Amino acid sequence: MVAILTPIYEAEFLGFSYGFRPGRSQHDALDALGYGIKGRYIWWILDADIRSFFDTISHSWLIRFVEHRIGDTRIVRLIQKWLKAGVLEEGQRLDTLEGTPQGAVISPLLANIYLHYVYDLWVHAWRKQRATGDLVVVRYADDTIVGFQHRSDAVSFLSDLKERLARFSLTLHPEKTRLLEFGRFAARRRAKRGEGKPETFDFPGFTHICGTKRNGQGFQVRRKTQRKRRMAKLTAVAKELRSRRHQTIHEQGQWLGAVLKGYYAYFAVPTNIGSLRAMRHHIKVRWRMALQRRSQRQRMGWRRMEGLADRYLPQPSILHPWPEQRFLVKHSR
């Protein structure tokens, strides 16, 4: 079913939608955002969080959206059947009029269809009809960032967005949705008002920070690993090390090396080298603690531990280009 529907909707989905689409990744979304903030007049960021999106998708609206594009009633009935299968709550299957089936392969596509009609097309029209300055938007699944040149546009957009979502059984999370000053002049303007450093925002997996280039000249969006993501990975590593306590040092080292390589593959972006080095250090510390708990007779001194780290834990290096470089290559005309 996904193989049938995907080509149909790929021809319909808009360019600023990146989540769960073939040939598009989280880094493509990050590149588009970085390029938009640096290359356009963007002084304000709306970090919009839809409350419990996957659990509150209206089945009736979703079916209407599918019927708008799909004329085959057999496909529509099959989707209705999946939706009526219900969701799991504390081990019990409940019939519901909202939400997408948990774990179903088709769920991400259905979510994209829903947001295409509820959000994407509306944002596209709003930008053309209402925006008085530059506006950039990037959406990855239900995580969306909108950048504005004018604060008045941002305030109007947020008010209109709340009304728009309410029509389709969706709401913004009041505590997680934020409008913040950002961009190349944010630090200077806040300093004049006697305020602190510009606020930061997260998208997806990275904290975005107003910064400068290494030579101190010129604005640069700096990205570092989101603290929540880093701590979750370290917690998972510590837990897995306990289950691997009977493995040899060589086996543990090979596994930890693979973990770090996978971590670097996503997070090794420009401006994030410090966070990567810290991650390697914290994994080394947790490995040492695990080895010491395993062998009470022989202490694992730092000199020996450094030798093991040099052998098994790869040093970080930047693997991804600057966002504007990769974005321009992929979207060159």
Regions found by a protein language model. Give the residues of each.
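Non-catalytic terminal/accessory segments
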Residues: 2-333
